Amino acid sequence: MLSDCEFDAARDTIRRALHEDLRYGLDITTQATVPAGTVVTGSMVPREPGVIAGVDVALLVLDEVFGVDGYRVLYRVEDGARLQSGQPLLTVQAAARGLLTAERTMLNLVCHMSGIATVTVAWVDAVRGTKAKIRDTRKTLPGLRALQKYAVRVGGGVNHRLGLGDTALIKDNHVAAVGSVVDALRAVRAAAPELPCEVEVDSLEQLDAMLAEEPELILLDNFPVWQTQVAVQRRDIRAPTVLLESSGGLSLENAAIYAGTGVDYLAVGALTHSVRILDIGLDL
C-alpha cells in the first residue's frame, strides 16, 4: 500500500504528466472524434504475464481528470497480483473523452511500476532459500523515486535509503576527500551519531579496517564470489552484528551464488535505472 508520502509524490508526478500532455491545449484528436457525453467501459489489460503495481496510482490519475466521483470502478486487482496476458487489472466506466485524456499517463506509470515489480520478483525468486534480501538503490529516475521504490516493495524487495539524509553511506569519493575509510567513518559518526552508517569497501584490507570499527553495514563493491566468501567468514568471526551487502557484477544468473555466500543484501540498481516496462494497454 502506498504511504502518505508516496501518495503525495504520486499526485505531484501525475499533475506534471498531465500538464505535459495538456499544456498546449486540450486533446484535439479526442475532442474531434468522440462526441461529448459518450460514456464507455475501459479495461487496463497486460499483453504479457507479469506482476502488477500501481493500480492506486492509475486511480489517482482518474481522480485528477474526473474528480473522485466522476467515474466508477467496476473491477480492480490489488498490487502484487500476478496476471497472465489478457487478464484485466482495472476496469472503469467513465466519460470517453476524459478516459482517453488520462490513458497515456495511467499506462506510462503502471507499465513502468509493474515492470519494476515483475523484475524484482524474479530477483527475489532467484535468491529464495538464502537469507539474502534484494535491495534497491538511489539509481532512480528523477521525480519517480517514491513510486519506483514502492514498486520494488510490491515485488518483495527491500528499500535502501530514500535520500541522502536518512542513512549515511560512505563511498570511494568520500574516502578520497578525507584520506582513509576509517577517517571517513569517524567523521560521519561525529557529525551524525544518531544515523546508521554504511561503508563501501573495495578490498579485503578495507574490510578488515571496517570490521574493527563495526559500522551498521559494509558494502562489498565488485567483490568476486571467492572474495565475498572470505568477507563473510571474517565478518562472522570478528563482527557478527555487522551486515554485509554485495554490489556490482550481479545478475539473475549469479544472484543465487552470491546470496549463498551468506551476505545479507544484494544491491540491484537495475531494478529501477533500466528496467523494461510491462506491456499493458487500455481496451475500450
From Swiss-Prot:
Keywords: Glycosyltransferase, Pyridine nucleotide biosynthesis, Transferase. This is Nicotinate-nucleotide pyrophosphorylase [carboxylating]. NCBIfam families: nadC. It catalyses: nicotinate beta-D-ribonucleotide + CO2 + diphosphate = quinolinate + 5-phospho-alpha-D-ribose 1-diphosphate + 2 H(+). It is an enzyme of class 2 (transferase). InterPro entries: Aldolase_TIM, NadC, NadC/ModD, Nicotinate_pribotase-like_C, Quinolinate_PRibosylTase_N_sf, Quinolinate_PRibosylTrfase_C, Quinolinate_PRibosylTrfase_N. One of its GO terms (cellular component) is cytoplasm. Belongs to the NadC/ModD family. GO terms for biological process: NAD biosynthetic process; quinolinate catabolic process. Disulfide bonds: none annotated. Pathway: Cofactor biosynthesis; NAD(+) biosynthesis; nicotinate D-ribonucleotide from quinolinate: step 1/1. SUPFAM superfamilies: Nicotinate/Quinolinate PRTase C-terminal domain-like, Nicotinate/Quinolinate PRTase N-terminal domain-like. Transmembrane segments: none annotated. Hexamer formed by 3 homodimers. Its EC number is 2.4.2.19. Substrate binds at residues 104, 137-139, 161, 171, 200, 221, 247-249, 268-270. Involved in the catabolism of quinolinic acid (QA). GO terms for molecular function: nicotinate-nucleotide diphosphorylase (carboxylating) activity.
